[in-house]
Amino acid sequence: VEFFGDTLEALTSKYTKFIAILQENEQGFAYPVLIGDETKKAWDLRKAGLGLLRNLPGDTQPVNLIEDCAVAVEDLPDYMDELELILQRFHVQYSVYAHAGAGELHVEPMLNLKEEKGRKDFREILKQTTELVKKYKGSLSGEHGDGRLRGEFIPQMMGEKVYALFQETKQIVDPNGVFNRGKIVDTPPMDAFLRVDSLQNTNHLPQTVFDFSAQENILRLSEKCSGSGDCRKTEITGGTMCPSFMATRQEQQTTRARANMLRNFYGDQTEAHANQL
């Protein structure tokens, strides 16, 4: 929670009263106060949240699914109460972060998409959450886009008549489906292009020179890439980045692209794949 004041005394009065309210209602367990330039630490931590969550060990990971749902701020408490009940029915843990002040909390269920149950829950959680968001007249994608993940549920969210208008508009302006095909209309099933393979066999991964036992193996390490592209740093933004990308600005030279390559290669250790190599 961010406070502003013309003087340090006024600012101190505001956050002191706020902390007292939290303590009175037994909300929270720590109340750190950051002043001036120190506030950047809090915002940096929030930005790093996605990458930090991807460092959990094992195949059960927080997934992008319902993290972009948004409702009116006054409806957010009731929405979150009902969403929690949905997730409890599936017996899944979840993480929550981001901007409550805009009516949007990034809720990420922790699922194992390499198991059949995880994939079924993946679809059903989004289906039930879509109905919940619709109930509160919210948005499935309050900050970003529906895309291939949520596009399948646009007819459910908007209604068939409105969706038919979307299709008609797309046909008029892009009859050949050149621009961003399958993102808003005629979207393929949400689980048609999952990056993970339920049949992954990690027993035949080759020995590597470097030790990746802390991440279990090199495949698990490559799977930690969330795809968010935070690695695409330049001399202007600062931060560590491969010099090859700094020079070429080519996606294939990014850390993300190399993680994708390793995941695709080591994730398909079938006999047919071995023969192709």
Describe the residue ranges of each PLM region.
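Extended, hydrophobic alpha-helical segments in both membrane/secreted and soluble proteins
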Residues: 18, 73-83, 90-150, 162-169, ...
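Polar, glycine-rich mid-to-C-terminal structural blocks
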Residues: 156, 160-221
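Short, hydrophobic beta-strand segments
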Residues: 1-5, 59-69, 105-115, 149-156
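Flexible helix-coil linker/hinge segments at domain or subdomain boundaries
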Residues: 23-33, 129-145, 175-181
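Ferredoxin-type iron-sulfur electron-transfer modules in oxidoreductases and energy-metabolism complexes
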Residues: 196-277
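Terminal amphipathic helices with adjacent charged low-complexity linkers/tails
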Residues: 2-60, 64, 98-100, 125, ...
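A glycine-rich phosphate-binding loop feature that marks nucleotide/adenosyl-phosphate handling sites
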Residues: 32-48, 97-108, 142-154, 181-201, ...
